[in-house]
Swiss-Prot record:
This is Gamma-glutamyl phosphate reductase. Catalyzes the NADPH-dependent reduction of L-glutamate 5-phosphate into L-glutamate 5-semialdehyde and phosphate. The product spontaneously undergoes cyclization to form 1-pyrroline-5-carboxylate. Pathway: Amino-acid biosynthesis; L-proline biosynthesis; L-glutamate 5-semialdehyde from L-glutamate: step 2/2. Belongs to the gamma-glutamyl phosphate reductase family. PROSITE patterns: PROA. It comes from Pasteurella multocida (strain Pm70). GO terms for biological process: L-proline biosynthetic process. Pfam families: Aldedh. The lineage of its organism: Bacteria, Pseudomonadati, Pseudomonadota, Gammaproteobacteria, Pasteurellales.
Amino acid sequence: MTTNLQEMGKQAKQAAFVLAQLSQQQKNQALEIIAQQLEAQSDKILAENQKDIALAKQNGLSDAIIDRLLLTPSRLNDIANDVHHVISLADPVGQLIDGGILDSGLKIERVRVPLGVIGTIYEARPNVTIDVASLCLKTGNAVILRGGKETQYSNKILVDVVQHALVQAGLPKYAIQAITDPDRHLVMELLKLDRYVDMIIPRGGASLHELCKQHSTIPVIVGGIGVCHLFIEQSADLDKALPLIENAKTQRPSTCNTLETLLVQRAIATQFLPKLAQHLSAKHVKFHADPTALAILQSVQADVEPVQAHQLRQEWLSYDLNVVIVDDIEQAIAHIREYGSQHSDGILTGSQRLAQQFVAQVDSAAVYVNASTRFTDGGQFGLGAEVAVSTQKLHARGPMGLEALTTYKWVCVGDYCVRS
């Protein structure tokens, strides 16, 4: 373990002790300064981001990755607004969860407290730097950030802005730190830093999550892989379904809550798929279809090719869409269980009974009825900027907002009580 990373961990732990004692007013003041500095330093931030974009293009990175990497004035404004929204949220730290008084007279309360130090490993998403920093600060947690090399210029300027704001607010600079060295071995070292780090949150592709699961000695939040499905059932309103599917697939295809596989009930396939192909033609969606859907889509000259088995488990993060024909809801649910990632899956239907069946039997973090999967987001759910979307079941599930960055302690107060 390098001395540098050990020192970062030690500094983060010391900062976490300070943050845990702060009032909501003190934390909100620091967050307000961060939001102000994001706006004041926007030109510098965007200029540094363009360096990352230029390198990404030079290195031949995909359009999906470049879209994730890109900051625009609008996106930077959205990030600052997310910080303001976090300010407006109630501080969960110190909340009384439950409690009572024992026969012995001992008063017991379960109180919400910060986790301590969070380690976040992420790829080409500079917005994560501010999302994580603001949520951790609001909940009294310190954080060590390790962004991908693709975001080195963006992350450095963003962390500089945050640390400057912390100092202005009279808080420890080391509450928010970033590993700027692109050496991949430092990721492995961070995963072993259990003396100081209390939780690891990876945000990236399947390989990153698998790496963290296999090598971390620190609890890991698993999630973010979005092989999301929509099942359109024969009683659905087909005209209303078209713009919904367009939204789920094309609004921002590089996100983890984007639709990747459309399941179409056989009874409406011949009627619906030509309409879908026409509706999505302007968006240049490329279909990957099973034999039945392939024949229908080819008959209307859609951009389509046969779907390969491995593509049914693929997070496209692009304008590609799998189309699979199923006989009924049972086949749709079976397909989702086999190929889904337990992220976000939905049904389009006019049947309350089938909607209830789908909700009960699909085991995903977010299950939708007649709505786009694009809603799986901390801001959309009213949680503020999210730190991640968890697809596991322990500790947190779905978009992780403020409460997901806390744990609890038992506070026991007596009058010199002894156990009999």
